[in-house]
Amino acid sequence: MRDESAKGSRLKANVLRFALALAALAGLAALNAGAQSAQDPAPQRPSITGISHVGYFVSDLPRALTFWHGLLGFDQPYTLKKKGSDEIGIAFIKINDRQHVELFNEPPTAPPNLMSHVCFTVDNVEQMRAYLRARGFDLKPGNGAKTQAGDYAFEIKDPDGTLIEFVQTLPTGMEAQAAGRFLPDTRIANGIYHVGFLVGNSEKALAFYHDVLGFKEIWRGSSSPSVLSWINMQVPDGSDYVEFMLYAKLPATFGTQNHVSLVVADAQRAISVLEARPAYKSYGKPLEMRVGKNGKHQVNLFDPDGTRVELMEPGTVDGKPVPSSTAPPPVHE
């Protein structure tokens, strides 16, 4: 009995020593993990270099192509088919080698909003996903899915629900493969200047675009001295910008507010060129050059669905910058 009691005591002692050893190992592992975590810096945001593209829904693709190709003079280098169909799902309108407009041949997902999304170019999609994940966005590690056009890309939503895409252009993708081609002299403009879209809460929008994405505020404008109308936010590593179209009450139609602005050297000459084209007869709307609140010449056109395409000169009419508005933003209803 004494031997069995001694064996039991030794067994209990061994179990206790083993448990203490496991606890010590666990504590050491936790300590090492904490030290490693302290050493590893938070993921850094990769470069956001510009606007890659903007997408719009169209109800009649042939008419939309007449507008973009016949009137504005841009080429359609490639298309994507609808799933399980030979029908065109997306038509790509090439603006330059790094920018395009996507025409979605389908009903809008959230009418009357005809803007599908806006996409920004980044130099590393995997790093962008890691950066946003560290900022609380629900994103899995990795490059994300390859698009049908052959590039790495993923999407999130901004505070207003606008779909925001980030793309890393790959050498094997359709855009890179088309570099240097599909750039006819008929193009009325050679670049996307900015993209404008509705924003209801400017404070939340600034927290997202400035605090998270690193965009820089470059100008504020007002159509009225009592309330702010627009905030321009430039990408952190380029010259392209987005324009917050501020509102208190959501408008009944979005087409005038949600727009793409194309840069032209001479707005009056652009009007003359457009009016001389056969497609202008079917366009059927007068073209008028105006001076915007930002002091720049601009011309507004509308696609067959009412989405605004703005032609804008890059400089002010007198060469002097227009001061930013100090009016308060509208109170979102």
Locate the predicted segments by residue.
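Vicinal oxygen chelate
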Residues: 36-47, 49-59, 91-94, 107-191, 197, 219-222, ...
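Ordered, small/hydrophobic-rich secondary-structure cores
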Residues: 40, 54, 72-76, 80-150
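Core segments of cupin and vicinal oxygen chelate
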Residues: 46, 55-100, 134, 196-241, ...
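Structured core of small recognition/catalytic domains
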Residues: 203-206, 210-290
